[in-house]
């Protein structure tokens, strides 16, 4: 069965060798064409879980294209014929834009191509794909405005926006134990225990579920702290105490989130994926359990990135890390250049957006890297996430080039130069010099073996070389070879 498909309601097709009750090995519920199904041992990568499904296709899984079209037409007809149009131009503009977006979302949810996930429902992931398109178009619109117009345009979204942010004091007293404060000497620690602590933990837990690799998560976590150190001269909120960077963030929040995420991945890898239709389950307890498991994956794939296996995979993993770090930095820089308070709901909505699209994008990237086909296309969600990250960066560059061009401190630039040189040196050695050296050694070894084989061939010919006697060959071998036997 083709990757990314699931058996339809009819169960196994007559042409398929799949045993009854077995489903495809991937998540979406779209049925394949005849003859495309394969058994659990066929067409499945070693990192993919085995799935058993009774093939039930209920009303819940159908596309409902005509139903959505009918409801949409009735709604537009009601607004057009029965509702009086207000005379407020600004209100009508907002309502027209929102209605246009909703119509596009209705079209996308019913007609867009399914992605790699199907739980809780394929329409859910199609919805976020369409939201990605809308968000990218919104960013493009902001990018083509002047700095002042772009900031003031956000007033149409929230009248409280478009106002310069007040300056805040970051960093400050970094003593873990403050002897001058007799009432509470640990007040600096308690001040840091705000709502961002559980947010950091939850964020890294979800990122671990996206990336599915401990090393990549730790590298991104540590590198972002280095970026905060490096850019605190540009953004004041990057200025934190050393223990806030390495103890609170890396070890406690990020580390604990990554640990819990890896434990969840371990459970998902070992879990048995056996699905039944809700009405095929006899007990109420089983039905409730089936409803709860609807919000878990249909199947599971372990990610084996193997960055050192080839130059292509190494560059791809480096690109993934770069996009992750840029998306993290864009969160802070966009708030700064667009004058958004950290607690504004738009900031939270952006994080919710990336949580929903990030997992699909990572799966599409992994399939793109892992597929042996040379001309496979990158998935649409991964393409949009990369485009959104790049567009956000361009907005930051356009809206506040002065902040971005503030020169790095000398010791910071030296550290990044040294790190870049080491990474480049390792890349050249691992994928060029090392391969050349190995090929040279292999060529020498093959030449030496060929010479040795030629010498053995001459030695086993009709006439033995000088100095070869029967003590080496033995009498039987000597007679068989035509050598003179002793008297």
UniProtKB/Swiss-Prot annotation:
Disulfide bonds: none annotated. It is found in: Endoplasmic reticulum membrane. Pathway: Phospholipid metabolism; phosphatidylserine biosynthesis. Residues 84-96, 148-313, 357-376, 425-487 are lumenal. Its EC number is 2.7.8.29. GO terms for molecular function: CDP-diacylglycerol-serine O-phosphatidyltransferase activity; L-serine-phosphatidylethanolamine phosphatidyltransferase activity; transferase activity. It holds the Pfam family PSS. One of its GO terms (biological process) is phosphatidylserine biosynthetic process. It comes from the Eukaryota. The keyword Protein transport does not apply. One of its GO terms (cellular component) is endoplasmic reticulum membrane. It catalyses: a 1,2-diacyl-sn-glycero-3-phosphoethanolamine + L-serine = a 1,2-diacyl-sn-glycero-3-phospho-L-serine + ethanolamine; 1-hexadecanoyl-2-(9Z-octadecenoyl)-sn-glycero-3-phosphoethanolamine + L-serine = 1-hexadecanoyl-2-(9Z-octadecenoyl)-sn-glycero-3-phospho-L-serine + ethanolamine; 1-hexadecanoyl-2-(4Z,7Z,10Z,13Z,16Z,19Z-docosahexaenoyl)-sn-glycero-3-phosphoethanolamine + L-serine = 1-hexadecanoyl-2-(4Z,7Z,10Z,13Z,16Z,19Z-docosahexaenoyl)-sn-glycero-3-phosphoserine + ethanolamine; 1-octadecanoyl-2-(5Z,8Z,11Z,14Z)-eicosatetraenoyl-sn-glycero-3-phosphoethanolamine + L-serine = 1-octadecanoyl-2-(5Z,8Z,11Z,14Z)-eicosatetraenoyl-sn-glycero-3-phosphoserine + ethanolamine. Residues 1-50, 451-487 are annotated as: Disordered. The modification Phosphothreonine is found at residue 485. Keywords: Endoplasmic reticulum, Glycoprotein, Lipid biosynthesis, Lipid metabolism, Membrane, Phospholipid biosynthesis, Phospholipid metabolism, Phosphoprotein, Transferase, Transmembrane, Transmembrane helix. The modification Phosphoserine is found at residues 16, 24. Residues 1-10 have a biased composition (Basic and acidic residues). The keyword tRNA-binding does not apply. Glycans are attached at residue 181. The chain crosses the membrane at residues 63-83, 97-117, 127-147, 314-334, 336-356, 377-397, 404-424. Residues 1-62, 118-126, 335, 398-403 are cytoplasmic. Requires calcium ions. Inhibited by exogenous phosphatidylserine. It is a multi-pass membrane protein. Belongs to the phosphatidyl serine synthase family. Catalyzes a base-exchange reaction in which the polar head group of phosphatidylethanolamine (PE) or phosphatidylcholine (PC) is replaced by L-serine. Catalyzes the conversion of phosphatatidylethanolamine and does not act on phosphatidylcholine. Can utilize both phosphatidylethanolamine (PE) plasmalogen and diacyl PE as substrate and the latter is six times better utilized, indicating the importance of an ester linkage at the sn-1 position. This is Phosphatidylserine synthase 2. The gene is PTDSS2.
